[in-house]
Amino acid sequence: MDETSIINENTDVFEKKITLIERNLQEITINDKEIIRKIIRKRNLKIYWGTAITGKPHIGYFLPILKIKDFVEAECEVTILFADIHGFLDNLKAPIELIENRYHYYEKIIKIMLMSVGCDINKIRFVKGSDYQKNSDYVFDLYKLCSYTTERDCKRAGSDVVKQRDNVLLSSLIYPNMQALDEEYLKVDAQFGGEDQRKIFMHAKTFLPKLGYKKRIHLMNPMMPGLNSDKMSSSDELSKIDLLDTEQQINKKINKCFCEEGNLQSGVLHVFEFVIFHYYTSISINKKSYTSIEDVKKDFEMKLIHPKDLKLACSNYINKMVTPIRNEMLKDIDMIKKAYNN
């Protein structure tokens, strides 16, 4: 192979990696695109995604899971953080006495989801937050970070993620500082999360340098709206389709979604846009093929797709995605009961 061919091949590999890393993202924070390129020219990007151990994961988790698959295919060094301590810091969404059981639940279901989309989990590092967040160096850095941040700083940083209340708990204020420190202690170049994490990401960019640590890259995927609300949330049963929901429960939830003929403000269309079209390259609704959400929306707005047909197709595709995950999880009923007391 001559020198020109080698250069062209390296350029092709570089561009493929950049495309995989950046596609389907909602936002990459300012100036970070160029930093990504500088790193990729030298070595593989180190990136982490953290998930707080709270309510049961839902179909909205397919968004980060599919993006993680992209990162792995781009040869990034990917770390997944199971943030168990964060789970109870956030207004005790996960009771302390259940946190260990819920960690095992999350670890299993996230790995099953990754395998269900064809991601090689052997190329991912899985970390439990409490395995390093109780170490003396981490805790002392947390004290130092708290000396630089005010109540207002931390309350603002967590306002889109941490549950808000009139008398804010100190634990909720610690949450953003710990998430900032995780970037340093996981030794990564970048943190990936939903766009609801933006204020925490900016908090990290502002305050980590005060401890002498570098600013990290931040990548954000869009947040999936709830079935009948602004955000699909693990802690809001009415907003989500749980990954353990039965076929009948899934059908019922989708059938109850607002879906007026010709009206694009529908939770059913959101499921197609944020989940189904990220999973499938082509779908069929009433025997017609579609390769983009834009085409589905166009036909629905023109009343060429009836709400009943839209809901039926939505239910069918979600059930195909969820059924193998549910079946695998139900092999360990005892683990589920211990995690969620039911």
UniProtKB/Swiss-Prot annotation:
Per the annotation, the residue ranges of the short sequence motif 'KMSKS' region are 231-235
Entry GO CC: cytoplasm
Instruction: Report the locations given in the UniProt record.
Output: Cytoplasm
Q: What is its main location?
A: cytoplasm
Reactions catalysed: tRNA(Tyr) + L-tyrosine + ATP = L-tyrosyl-tRNA(Tyr) + AMP + diphosphate + H(+)
Q: Name one GO molecular function term.
A: tyrosine-tRNA ligase activity
Question: What keywords tag this UniProt record?
Answer: Aminoacyl-tRNA synthetase, ATP-binding, Cytoplasm, Ligase, Nucleotide-binding, Protein biosynthesis
The EC number(s) this enzyme carries: 6.1.1.1
Which family does the similarity line name? Belongs to the class-I aminoacyl-tRNA synthetase family.
Name of the protein this chain belongs to: Probable tyrosine--tRNA ligase, cytoplasmic
What high-level taxonomic lineage is stated for the organism?
A: Eukaryota, Fungi, Fungi incertae sedis, Microsporidia, Enterocytozoonidae
